[in-house]
Amino acid sequence: MMKVKVAINGYGTIGKRVADAVSLQDDMEVVGVTKTRPDFEAKLGAKRYPLYVAKPENVELFERAGIEIQGTIEDLLPKADIVVDCSPNKVGAENKAKYYEKAGIKAIFQGGEKKDVAEVSFNALANYDEAVGKSYVRVVSCNTTGLTRLIYMLKTNFSIGRIRATMLRRVVDPKEDKKGLVNGIMPDPVAIPSHHGPDVKTVLPDVDIVTTAFKLPTTLMHVHSLCVEMREAVKAEDVVSALSEEPRIMLISAEDGFTSTAKVIEFARELRLRYDLYENIVWRESIGVDGNDLFVTQAVHQEAIVVPENIDAIRAMFELAEKEESIRKTNESLGIGKVF
């Protein structure tokens, strides 16, 4: 079987993880990655993958730094069947207009891009089939991925009504040193809704959801607190049972020491490379029912949760596998599933 040739444009927080995940699959391979600047990530990336320069005008910088490059993004794209764009917010749309459309290449974009950059916004559990055969797909953001997975499982197993979700957002990724929030809690935005609810509706258009969001001075994970109106009587144990059937949702317990996101990440450091958590991390004790309202609290590792979604999007776009088969293969390759 011919493997799908994948280019990664942007070998950063998401890009390097997607590259490594692609390398674990038996039906796709990395043909090259790009960097804009000759920094330490570029030096390490060049040791693992063919390295190309994302901005052709920066070639001389790489040469002066002594980093071996194979060319520019314009040299890479003809060697690939698809490009996974992991550029900063809004740069993906620029790359589409400047490079991808001209090269006639399929492309996957990340959640920082506007929805109209692609033909479909994607989550493997919720709408895999909508991406089948498409040329441009947008994998929704880390927060939206976490919300969508959980809501999809709830609406698949129960009759649900209005959803209210509060997003407690990490302020920046751990490596960022140019911005942040050292002391304070920032409503983001102050007015409702935050963008997360409308973004969920790009994947699950029939969901009634409103979200608010706050930035907190932490870098480890996001936390979501959901209140879901249930249209039928339900017990907490029924929800626990339903969620436990989905490998991409990990149920944890405070009784086991998971008392904060710090403890969750410490667990992840023992579990996987780069302490990556691809799953929604749901506190079992947080699942509770009060009248018609279901409450759930989950944590989302923003650096990793979208990685399996990118892999499944590639399979859908090239019609390599049906939904269940793709998700199974991705889960097995990344070690997603029962941990305890």
From Swiss-Prot:
Source species of the chain: Archaeoglobus fulgidus (strain ATCC 49558 / DSM 4304 / JCM 9628 / NBRC 100126 / VC-16)
Gene this protein is translated from: gap
Pathway stated in the Swiss-Prot or TrEMBL entry: Carbohydrate degradation; glycolysis; pyruvate from D-glyceraldehyde 3-phosphate: step 1/5
Active site: 142
The protein, known as: Glyceraldehyde-3-phosphate dehydrogenase
Residues bound to NAD(+): 13-14, 112, 170, 302
Class of enzymatic activity (EC top level): oxidoreductase
One Pfam family recorded for the sequence: DapB_N
Record localization: Cytoplasm
Entry's EC annotation: 1.2.1.59
Primary location recorded for the protein, binned into one broad class: cytoplasm
Keyword Chaperone: no
MF term (GO), any: NAD binding
InterPro entries per the UniProt record, alphabetical: DapB_N, GlycerAld/Erythrose_P_DH, GlycerAld_3-P_DH_AS, GlycerAld_3-P_DH_cat, GlycerAld_3-P_DH_NAD(P)-bd, Glyceraldehyde-3-P_DH_2_arc, NAD(P)-bd_dom_sf
GO cellular component, one term: cytoplasm
Entry keyword NAD: yes
Signal sequence bounds: none
Domain of life (superkingdom): Archaea
Keywords: Cytoplasm, Glycolysis, NAD, NADP, Oxidoreductase
PROSITE patterns xrefs: GAPDH
Reactions performed catalytically: D-glyceraldehyde 3-phosphate + phosphate + NADP(+) = (2R)-3-phospho-glyceroyl phosphate + NADPH + H(+); D-glyceraldehyde 3-phosphate + phosphate + NAD(+) = (2R)-3-phospho-glyceroyl phosphate + NADH + H(+)
Binding positions (D-glyceraldehyde 3-phosphate): 141-143, 196-197
Similarity section: Belongs to the glyceraldehyde-3-phosphate dehydrogenase family.
Assembly notes: Homotetramer.
GO biological process, alphabetically ordered: glycolytic process; lysine biosynthetic process via diaminopimelate
